[in-house]
Amino acid sequence: MSAIGVYLAAYKQMGLQAYTIGDRDLGLGLKTLRSVARKASFPLLSSNVVHKDSGAKVFKGHTIIRKAGFKIAVIGATTSLFVNRNQLEESDNIRVIAPEESVAKEIKAAKAKGAQLFVLLGHLNESEVERTVRSNPEIQFVLGGQWVKMDSRAKKVGNAWVVGAYMRGKNLSVMDLYVQNKSLEFVDRNARQQLIRQQRTLESRIKGRERSIESARKDPKRKSSVEYLERNLVQLKTELQEVSLDLEDLVDPASDASYIKWDLRGMDTGFSDEKRVAKLVTAHRAIYPDPTKKPRNGKAPKPALKTSRTPKPTVRPKPGTPVR
C-alpha cells in the first residue's frame, strides 16, 4: 500500500483525470481497489467489471472531462482475456464481461450528459478494441495499453483513431487534438510521413534479415535458426506490402480540417525533473528498501523502522494507461 501511495501522489501532481483498471490491478483484490478509489484524486474506471449476482458495475464506467469548451466522455474497459480470470472472478464474486455492450451503455449515459467527444481508455488487446469500436461507431479515439506490437502511427479502425502504449509501462502514448472550424471530424496530417518512415524502416529490416539468412545457411552452427529467420522475413514483407498499399490509398487531408497529433514517448527512469516525486520515492524506500538491490555484503536490506519524521505516502495501483 505504501508504493500505491507514491503512485497516487505522483498522479495527482501530474493532473491525471482518469485511470482504467487493468487485469493486474484486479489482482490486488476489490477491497484494496475500493480503498484506492476512495483516496485517489481521479476516478478508477471500468465499464465491464461487474458484480456476479446483480450485474451492477463495480467501478465507474466513464467520466466527463471538460476541455477547450468541449465535453469529453472517457470510458474505461478492462480486458476479459487474462490467465487467472476465473480465480479472480470466484474470489471477489465478480465477472469481467466482453466490453462491447458495456461500452455502449456508457456512451448512452454520457450522451445524456451532453458529451461531444468519446474516448475509449482501454486496458484491452487489439482484437477487443476492434470489436468494441466497430460495434460502437460513436467512439472517436482509443488509447490502448496491451499491444503486442509497437505502433508507429495512429490507425483508423471504424470511426476511431486507435493508438497503443505498447506494454509494461515503458512508454507514454500522447494524443493531442486540434479543433478547427468547430469540426469534430479529425484527420492525421502526419500519416504520409509516418507511412514513408515505416516503409523505409521495413525495407532496411528486410535487407538485414536477408543477410542474416544467407549467413546462417553458411554456418553449420546457425542452420537451425534459418527457418525462424525465414518466417520473420515473410512477416516483414507482409507488413511492407500493407504499408505500401496504405500509402497508395492515402488521401491528403484538407488544410483547414481538425487534426490529431500522436507521439509514443519512452519513459524516463530518472527523477531529475520531478524532485517532488523523487522525494516520495526516497521516503518509501527508506521504509521499504528495493528488494532487487543488495548491499555489498550480499545480505538483503532490512526494512527501516517507521518514525514520526518519515513522510507518510498516500496510495495507488501500478501505472496504467493515463489520459491526456
For the regions a language model picked out, list residue spans one by one.
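Acidic, metal/ion-coordinating pockets
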Residues: 1-324
